[in-house]
From Swiss-Prot:
Main function: Part of a binding-protein-dependent transport system for phosphate; probably responsible for the translocation of the substrate across the membrane.
Domain ABC transmembrane type-1 residue range list: 70-273
Cellular compartments per GO CC: plasma membrane
Record-annotated membrane-spanning stretches: 20-42, 70-90, 110-130, 136-156, 197-217, 253-273
Compartments in which it is found: Cell inner membrane
Xref: PANTHER family: PHOSPHATE TRANSPORT SYSTEM PERMEASE PROTEIN PSTA
NCBIfam families xref list: 3a0107s02c
Record carries keyword Transcription: no
Keywords of this entry: Cell inner membrane, Cell membrane, Membrane, Phosphate transport, Transmembrane, Transmembrane helix, Transport
Family statement drawn from the similarity comment of this UniProt entry: Belongs to the binding-protein-dependent transport system permease family. CysTW subfamily.
UniProt protein name: Phosphate transport system permease protein PstA
Chief location category: membrane
């Protein structure tokens, strides 16, 4: 009896120690997150004004805004999503619906996993060699292509996973009434997996909206307003990078404000994506 009691006490002490270590580790992580968000709010909110969204990036020593950088980020992100999403959805559909157990799917999944974990600067260098050097100049379209390449693996993985979660009974029911396979995929599988696929697209947007490295090698930057996709275009991440390293207080303040804008945008997209996932699980 005493042996059982002592064993219980020993396990209880070990459990308490491990729980304490887990709480401390979680607290350290949350503390760093709180410090980062606190610094962004403290320094970023000080520069928030209407001029940030209505004026162009200023020359050194002058006041201004981030209008052209915000516009450039939106344009390249939209193009990247438009290009990357269909490719990712179709590839994920093939892997889940047509070639689930094929060797080609295994190879594609392996390559996709590599792309998911590859540093974005490698994608930037690849597009630089593929487009920028042959064209002879930086361009917004090259930046959009780099972002599209970053979008594809995220959407592929999400689409495949969501379609694999669709019960086979639904597919069999569609096939039983004589529907072709592509109709079953479109009307049954896609409908059941829609919220999960949309979640993956939103997470892809959240990822590329803060990417700096691939745009440094492709779209570079532009201090002026530009709607020409065949010319360098400003973007918020690159502008933040440039302004944060400058010795000018006005530029540094705009860098903090731009960082706050990106952080809040990514946070909002992530929360919305999680809410979609939660609704799907409730159903």
């Amino acid at each position: 009896m005493s042996t059982a009691a002592s064993l219980h006490q020993s396990r209880k002490r070990k459990n308490g120690v491990m729980m304490m270590l887990c709480v401390v580790a979680a607290g350290i992580g949350l503390a760093w997150l709180a410090l980062i968000l606190g610094a962004l709010l403290y320094k970023g909110l000080a520069g928030v004004s209407l001029s940030v969204f209505t004026e162009m990036t200023p020359p050194p020593g002058d006041a201004g805004g981030l209008l052209n950088a915000i516009y450039g980020s939106i344009v390249m992100t939209i193009i990247g999503i438009i290009v990357g999403t269909p490719i990712g959805v179709l590839a994920g559909t093939y892997m889940a619906e047509y070639g689930r157990f094929s060797k080609l799917t295994t190879v594609v999944r392996f390559i996709n996993d590599i792309l998911l974990s590859a540093p974005s600067i490698i994608i930037g260098l690849f597009v630089y060699e593929l487009m920028v050097r042959p064209m002879g100049h930086f361009s917004a379209i090259a930046g959009a292509v780099a972002l599209a390449i970053l979008v594809i693996p995220v959407v592929v993985r999400t689409t495949e996973d969501m379609l694999n979660l669709v019960p086979n009974a639904l597919r069999e029911a569609g096939t039983a009434i004589g529907a072709p396979r592509w109709v079953v995929i479109r009307s049954v599988a896609y409908r059941a997996a829609l919220s999960g696929i949309v979640t993956g697209i939103l997470l892809a947007i959240a990822r590329i909206s803060g990417e700096t490295a691939p745009l440094l090698f492709t779209a570079l930057n532009n201090q002026f307003w530009s709607s020409n996709l065949n010319a360098p275009m400003a973007s918020l991440p690159v502008t933040i990078f440039q302004f944060a390293l400058s010795p000018y207080e006005e530029w540094q303040q705009l860098a903090w404000t731009g960082a706050l804008i990106i952080t809040l945008t990514v946070l909002a997209l992530s929360i919305f994506a999680r809410s979609l996932t939660g609704r799907r699980e409730d159903k």
